[in-house]
């Protein structure tokens, strides 16, 4: 495993991304509940239609380090293979029936609650795909990124974002191909989710966030609180225990 942070361009050395995190407004409890409910519905969708998926980016970090949603995070990030996107769109009524919004996007698919914003409508191209960075819904938002097999890193075959913009924004977010196709189960808040096998997950998170991802935040500060935010129902159960 490469621990040479001097040559890394991981997110914890990217000033623009660190400033973005620092400016995030933590979700309130109502929003947290909606985030978990949308996540739960998405997992059920993938399981119903036999789609391999992973939680990625900050959601993978939150699962491995905090056990769920990082307190400042306001969405969940999923990843699926590019070959499965048409299956998602073909069966989008699953989400619509549950009052969720679904839109095609440059990165893959955007899901959420509330109404689509005017700015998101203006960002659509001729194929009705939202282009560029965007939180398109007035409620909570969720990304489903598309991945594909793409080259080697440290002689390890990896999966990368299909979106060129995503590759430029998160160049070190590469997932070991072996782990991608052989997921295990982990806990995210109160939900059971697909996760990479531990050695693949550690490698992925170190590439993405550097060797101190388990103990430090993006500003280089040692973390004192490793808790996650929970759905209110789960918080009540925890208090009773």
Q: Where do the protein language model's features map onto the residues?
A:
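N-terminal regions immediately upstream of nucleotidyltransferase
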Residues: 1-38
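Short, surface-exposed basic-aromatic patches at helix termini and helix-loop junctions that form
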Residues: 70-71, 93-96
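Conserved catalytic core of two-metal-ion nucleotidyltransferases
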Residues: 24-49, 95-203, 208, 216-240
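Short amphipathic alpha-helices within nucleic acid-binding modules
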Residues: 81, 86-91
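Short cationic amphipathic helices and targeting signals
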Residues: 75-80, 193
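Short, well-structured secondary-structure segments
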Residues: 8, 13, 31-34, 51-62, ...
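Generic hydrophobic alpha-helical membrane-span motif
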Residues: 64, 81-83, 196
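Active-site nucleotide-donor binding segment shared across nucleotidyl transfer reactions
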Residues: 43-76, 85
């Amino acid at each position: 495993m490469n621990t040479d942070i001097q040559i890394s361009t991981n997110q914890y050395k990217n000033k623009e991304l660190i400033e973005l995190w620092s400016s995030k407004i933590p979700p309130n409890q109502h929003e947290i509940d909606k985030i978990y409910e949308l996540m739960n519905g998405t997992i059920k969708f993938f399981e119903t239609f036999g789609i391999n998926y992973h939680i990625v980016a900050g959601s993978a970090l939150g699962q491995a380090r905090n056990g769920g949603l990082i307190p400042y995070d306001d969405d969940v990030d999923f990843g699926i293979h590019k070959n499965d996107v048409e299956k998602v769109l073909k069966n989008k009524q699953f989400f619509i029936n549950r009052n969720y919004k679904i839109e095609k996007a440059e990165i893959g698919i955007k899901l959420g609650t509330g109404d689509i914003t005017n700015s998101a409508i203006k960002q659509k191209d001729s194929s009705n795909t939202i282009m560029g960075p965007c939180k398109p819904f007035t409620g909570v938002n969720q990304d489903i990124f598309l991945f594909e097999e793409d080259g080697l890193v440290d002689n390890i075959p990896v999966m990368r974002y299909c979106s060129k913009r995503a590759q430029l924004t998160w160049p070190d977010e590469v997932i070991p191909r072996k782990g991608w196709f052989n997921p295990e189960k982990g806990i995210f808040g109160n939900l059971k989710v697909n996760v990479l096998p531990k050695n693949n997950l550690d490698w992925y998170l170190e590439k993405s966030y550097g060797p101190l991802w388990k103990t430090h935040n993006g500003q280089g500060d040692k973390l004192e609180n490793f808790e996650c935010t929970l759905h209110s129902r789960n918080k009540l159960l925890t208090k009773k225990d």
